[in-house]
């Protein structure tokens, strides 16, 4: 198939390709198409297209994925693909190369469990020694932050690194992992003061630090000596300026030559000025006013257009200094603590205690100081595939790309509750959302698929926040803060499944699965203080594989403990998401969708028995009910969804309301598009490159086009490429559906660009970023989750 930028659907005829590669000329043409300069080292590399040793080095470093061997893998894959009757055989049956592979056809194919079934003509032979360097992939990088507490931060100052600590004995066993990652720094040689960054050279604007300021105030000197040259990608034009008519990075922009000029005054002086076209009609608002404004003059990224849930720095300072009034939350927390103490006293009573003393204990129970507000109604259904909360990977530019490709529900990266209460900028920044995420999901309510009369689609949005905490009082106050300072939230999700040691050992994440009384109090407290924002929870099957606890956890979340059920009603959990693995399993086993189906049946039974399990003497208070019709709970499944076939099977067979997708979206974000169209889409390498270009544009939009913003965009693009390179084009597969956990052998793509994008070699990832962001900064470092792919600046 020629790489002409067209999407190939399953069963669609494609042009034959005699050779897997199409030569360096095709890649050069691709770079020119997107105004991306051809990096020197990439040009040199492509000149070796006939050099077998180079091809082996670039394509052999494919990651191994943890996957249990067994005959089940083949039969399940074949059975799931029998429904795809439109697929055609593209090899032995005489069809052209590059066509969609057959569905479930095995024939004489040498199928090895855990190995992707790539067609023989694309597989290359590599030495055993070279293969041995490829280690197993640790996909926990996408689920929770690792040993670096400063990692996974969507802020410019705080995301570049974190505190380093000593390794414990258990950490030493995980020798292949970068548990304490550092990303170097991307700074200008001369730091230009923010008081000058957005103003013309002769502007009278004064620096608030006066003579004590350590930064430069000389714009000309900064441009000549203090910064690297302009990036040549995008034709040298600033993507932010092209979008808004002004650039929020000012003189610090790596594309500043495209929006600056020198003017000569009457007295002969020449002044450097920034161009501002935001008043022009195409950039103006609907009312004719100026479309965008640069806030404050301090170069901050807190007020970028199209970004919501921006929390003012003054509020963060007040939180840090403990000046925010949490009187109402404190009142509810005191009641919860008293309630817990009475419960402990009641359950620990002596057998010889008299009935009178037991009655005295019961008499001390009091009602909550106030009732929760009625919640905004939610809807989860087959039309609303959801993107899972992904630490580091689920940043705003990536979520924006997924929404553009058909994702209907998104979640923030996991924010820690205590840092939120301390006003930590990094955690509050995680809650920012793009304007596409705060619009209603793109489905139309109808009588056939929509029966909830009190659901207001116009008030619904796509974006929800996920938080983690280990104490009821912490998450209760965090929910209060989110309700007050982040108005654009669909829901607040409590993480009860994070397997990372740092979270688990502190009593949060999956540790809550074995502290169900505390978990119930956390949900009640959050529900009481979240205003109209619904509360949801994400759980795992359990901590230990041998001791699944999901059914009992679901019971507590749905109806509360027996001693509270009649008096207080349900805790108020609107939806539950179950990840079909235990904490112990991590990603070493497939997600257990049969178990998810059993829990879904349990939820259905609970919903049917709701009236019998709640107080029959009086109608339940609407504020105590979960956020759906008649107080019924939504149930989402999560784990290993990698095709529209699997998505449909999970909805129909496991009977979940919808599926939450994590790694599958990281590897191919257009999975949401496939789900919407109910067909496989064979994206060409050129099309996939356009998604990378969009990510870069979105990254520069949110993080800035200065040196720091370019460095952050490059880092998070590399984080994404560490997953995206594992995509195997369906035209290269023997049969469908593809398996998320299959490890691909070393192979060559249908052209040079496809081969480059399939490489597990970090040097090739760097080359891809250089197409749009220019050469890396001398101080830049990249350390992915596994050391085998680490990158450091070479000097």
Residue ranges: model-predicted function:
Residues 396-400, 472-486, 544-556, 613-661, ...:
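Catalytic cores of alpha/beta
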Residues 313-316, 321-361, 435-529, 533-534, ...:
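Active-site beta->alpha loop and helix N-cap motifs at the rims of alpha/beta catalytic domains
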């Amino acid at each position: 198939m020629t790489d002409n930028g067209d999407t190939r659907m399953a069963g669609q005829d494609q042009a034959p390709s005699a050779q897997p590669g199409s030569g360096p000329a095709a890649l050069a043409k691709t770079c020119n198409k997107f105004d991306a300069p051809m990096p020197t080292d990439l040009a040199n590399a492509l000149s070796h297209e006939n050099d077998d040793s180079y091809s082996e080095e670039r394509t052999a470093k494919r990651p191994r994925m943890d996957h249990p061997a067994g005959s089940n893998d083949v039969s399940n894959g074949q059975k799931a693909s029998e429904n795809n009757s439109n697929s055609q055989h593209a090899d032995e049956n005489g069809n052209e190369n590059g066509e969609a592979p057959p569905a479930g056809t095995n024939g004489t194919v040498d199928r090895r469990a855990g190995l992707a079934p790539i067609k023989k003509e694309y597989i290359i032979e590599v030495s055993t020694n070279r293969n041995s360097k490829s280690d197993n992939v640790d996909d926990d990088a996408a689920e929770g932050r690792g040993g670096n507490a400063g990692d996974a931060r969507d802020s410019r100052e705080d995301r570049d690194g974190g505190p380093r600590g000593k390794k414990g004995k258990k950490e030493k066993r995980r020798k292949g992992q970068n548990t304490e990652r550092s990303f170097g720094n991307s700074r200008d040689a001369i730091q230009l003061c923010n008081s000058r960054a957005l103003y013309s050279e002769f502007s009278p604007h004064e620096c608030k630090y006066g003579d004590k300021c350590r930064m430069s105030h000389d714009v000309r000197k900064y441009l000549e000596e203090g910064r690297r040259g302009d990036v040549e990608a995008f034709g040298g034009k600033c993507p932010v300026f092209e979008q808004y008519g002004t650039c929020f990075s000012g003189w610090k922009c790596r594309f500043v030559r495209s929006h600056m000029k020198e003017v000569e005054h009457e007295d002969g002086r020449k002044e450097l000025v920034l161009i501002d076209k935001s008043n022009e009609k195409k950039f103006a608002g609907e009312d004719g006013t100026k479309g965008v404004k640069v806030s404050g003059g301090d170069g901050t990224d807190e007020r970028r257009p199209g970004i919501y849930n921006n929390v003012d720095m003054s509020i963060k300072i007040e939180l840090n200094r403990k000046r925010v009034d949490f009187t109402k939350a404190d009142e509810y927390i005191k009641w919860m603590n008293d309630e817990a103490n009475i419960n402990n006293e009641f359950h620990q009573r002596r057998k010889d205690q008299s009935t009178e003393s037991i009655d005295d204990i019961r008499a001390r129970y009091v009602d909550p100081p106030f009732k929760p507000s009625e919640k905004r109604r939610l809807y989860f259904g087959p039309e609303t595939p959801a993107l899972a909360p992904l630490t580091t990977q689920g940043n705003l530019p990536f979520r924006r790309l997924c929404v553009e490709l058909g994702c209907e529900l998104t979640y923030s990266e996991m924010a820690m509750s205590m840092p939120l209460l301390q006003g930590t900028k990094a955690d509050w920044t995680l809650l920012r959302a793009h304007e596409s995420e705060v619009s209603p999901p793109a489905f139309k309510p109808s009588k056939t698929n929509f029966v909830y009369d009190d659901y207001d689609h116009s008030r619904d949005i796509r974006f929800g926040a996920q938080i983690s905490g280990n104490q009821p009082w912490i998450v209760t106050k965090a929910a209060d803060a989110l309700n007050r300072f982040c108005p654009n939230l669909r829901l607040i999700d409590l993480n009860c499944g994070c397997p990372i040691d740092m979270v688990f050992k502190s009593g949060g994440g999956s540790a809550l699965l074995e502290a169900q009384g505390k978990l119930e109090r956390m949900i009640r407290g959050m529900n009481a203080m979240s205003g109209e924002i619904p509360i949801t929870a994400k759980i795992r099957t359990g901590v230990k594989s041998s001791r699944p606890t999901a059914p009992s956890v679901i019971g507590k979340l749905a109806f509360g403990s027996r001693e509270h059920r009649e008096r207080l009603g349900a805790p108020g959990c609107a939806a539950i998401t179950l990840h079909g693995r235990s904490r112990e399993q991590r990603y070493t086993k497939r997600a257990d969708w049969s178990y998810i189906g059993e829990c879904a049946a349990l939820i259905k039974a609970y919903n049917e028995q709701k009236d019998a399990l709640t107080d029959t003497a009086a109608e339940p208070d609407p504020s105590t009910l979960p956020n759906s019709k008649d107080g019924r709970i939504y149930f989402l499944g999560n784990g290993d969804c990698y095709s529209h076939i699997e998505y449909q099977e999970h909805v129909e067979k496991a009977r979940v309301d919808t599926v939450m997708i994590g790694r599958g979206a990281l590897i191919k974000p257009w999975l949401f598009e496939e789900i919407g169209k109910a067909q496989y889409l064979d994206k060409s390498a050129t099309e996939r490159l356009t998604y990378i270009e969009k990510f870069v544009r979105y990254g520069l939009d949110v993080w800035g086009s200065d040196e720091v913003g370019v460095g952050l965009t490059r880092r998070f693009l590399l984080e994404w490429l560490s997953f995206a390179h594992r995509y195997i084009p369906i035209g290269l597969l023997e049969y469908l559906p593809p398996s998320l956990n299959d490890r691909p052998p070393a192979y060559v793509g249908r052209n040079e660009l496809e081969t480059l994008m399939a490489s597990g070699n970090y040097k090739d990832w760097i080359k891809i970023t250089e197409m749009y962001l220019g050469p890396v900064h001398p101080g830049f470092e990249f350390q992915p989750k596994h050391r085998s792919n680490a990158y450091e600046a070479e000097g």
